[in-house]
Amino acid sequence: MNKTIMALAIMMASFAANASVLPETPVPFKSGTGAIDNDTVYIGLGSAGTAWYKLDTQAKDKKWTALAAFPGGPRDQATSAFIDGNLYVFGGIGKNSEGLTQVFNDVHKYNPKTNSWVKLMSLAPMGMAGHVTFVHNGKAYVTGGVNQNIFNGYFEDLNEAGKDSTAIDKINAHYFDKKAEDYFFNKFLLSFDPSTQQWSYAGESPWYGTAGAAVVNKGDKTWLINGEAKPGLRTDAVFELDFTGNNLKWNKLDPVSSPDGVAGGFAGISNDSLIFAGGAGFKGSRENYQNGKNYAHEGLKKSYSTDIHLWHNGKWDKSGELSQGRAYGVSLPWNNSLLIIGGETAGGKAVTDSVLISVKDNKVTVQN
């Protein structure tokens, strides 16, 4: 009898270890956004187009349910956050009424109770793409991202060039062959108050802005990890925003994913351990840039990291690996762990699965 019970226990443990974290997303999902509220996950945009879905993680029969479509058109690199039961979506990259790719600076609100969207009469003072968003004391905070005028101008130039390959090569060379500071990535910190729908200046980085950083916050601290310093060039920097007391303090932690860094990585916290995983970048680009080659990633192949790093005792330790490199998915806090939904793998392939990264006693567990 005891042997039977033991065999059953082993079988159940094996099943749990191999069970999917969440059901596959309804479509391959990358470059979108997502948020979690009361154990219900919401994802949308990116490769899902205007579609949004939700999933109750506590339901016995877990499944994705389609929601009302986003009214602002398909978008990549939007961000989202829940505040007081409503979902707010900030900016992104999409097509304007003339069919040109552009950065948006608008805000949409979704009401889960009525399954309805509304575009707010509120525009951020700068474009929002490649930015990060986090919530602190009932307000949304936005920082980082590309410069709206420079980014939009690049795509206007490409549109003018049409199919003229010579003109396109010239435009690309002109766009990428500049120093990082010449792209004016956003280093300002903006706050959005949903009660007034107003934007305010909340501070600025003493260093530089990034695009495609990973963000995670807990209590009065928020961490911005890696990201682009300019198009094609990542940074290995880690910034900490400390809201303790009345004055916001910016701190710089030891770098991670050195020397080249990554963008589109995933960040979370498990049992008070800060986690950074995945991301994509160009190996050798940092050396090229330091040697005076501004078009630092020219001719280099994008690589996808499998590394999982933990911040421990004041330094980063590589503590595990993903089953495959991935980037540009959604990372959310769930079950005291880091939940990764979707993303892209080598070649830019969008995926439908989820990954759960947990930490206990500085040991990493990865569940696919």
From Swiss-Prot:
<feature type="repeat" description="Kelch 5">
    <location>
        <begin position="222"/>
        <end position="265"/>
    </location>
</feature>
<dbReference type="Pfam" id="PF24996">
    <property type="entry name" value="NANM"/>
</dbReference>
<dbReference type="InterPro" id="IPR015915">
    <property type="entry name" value="Kelch-typ_b-propeller"/>
</dbReference>
<comment type="similarity">
    <text>Belongs to the NanM family.</text>
</comment>
<feature type="signal peptide">
    <location>
        <begin position="1"/>
        <end position="19"/>
    </location>
</feature>
<dbReference type="InterPro" id="IPR056734">
    <property type="entry name" value="NANM"/>
</dbReference>
<comment type="function">
    <text>Converts alpha-N-acetylneuranimic acid (Neu5Ac) to the beta-anomer, accelerating the equilibrium between the alpha- and beta-anomers. Probably facilitates sialidase-negative bacteria to compete successfully for limited amounts of extracellular Neu5Ac, which is likely taken up in the beta-anomer. In addition, the rapid removal of sialic acid from solution might be advantageous to the bacterium to damp down host responses.</text>
</comment>
<dbReference type="GO" id="GO:0042597">
    <property type="term" value="C:periplasmic space"/>
</dbReference>
<dbReference type="InterPro" id="IPR019936">
    <property type="entry name" value="NanM_proteobact"/>
</dbReference>
<feature type="repeat" description="Kelch 6">
    <location>
        <begin position="287"/>
        <end position="336"/>
    </location>
</feature>
<keyword id="KW-0732">Signal</keyword>
<feature type="repeat" description="Kelch 1">
    <location>
        <begin position="40"/>
        <end position="84"/>
    </location>
</feature>
<comment type="subunit">
    <text>Homodimer.</text>
</comment>
<keyword id="KW-0677">Repeat</keyword>
<keyword id="KW-0413">Isomerase</keyword>
<keyword id="KW-0880">Kelch repeat</keyword>
<dbReference type="GO" id="GO:0016857">
    <property type="term" value="F:racemase and epimerase activity, acting on carbohydrates and derivatives"/>
</dbReference>
<protein>
    <recommendedName>
        <fullName>N-acetylneuraminate epimerase</fullName>
        <ecNumber>5.1.3.24</ecNumber>
    </recommendedName>
</protein>
<feature type="repeat" description="Kelch 2">
    <location>
        <begin position="86"/>
        <end position="137"/>
    </location>
</feature>
<feature type="repeat" description="Kelch 4">
    <location>
        <begin position="174"/>
        <end position="219"/>
    </location>
</feature>
<feature type="active site" description="Proton acceptor">
    <location>
        <position position="228"/>
    </location>
</feature>
<feature type="repeat" description="Kelch 3">
    <location>
        <begin position="139"/>
        <end position="173"/>
    </location>
</feature>
<keyword id="KW-0119">Carbohydrate metabolism</keyword>
<feature type="repeat" description="Kelch 7">
    <location>
        <begin position="338"/>
        <end position="367"/>
    </location>
</feature>
<keyword id="KW-0574">Periplasm</keyword>
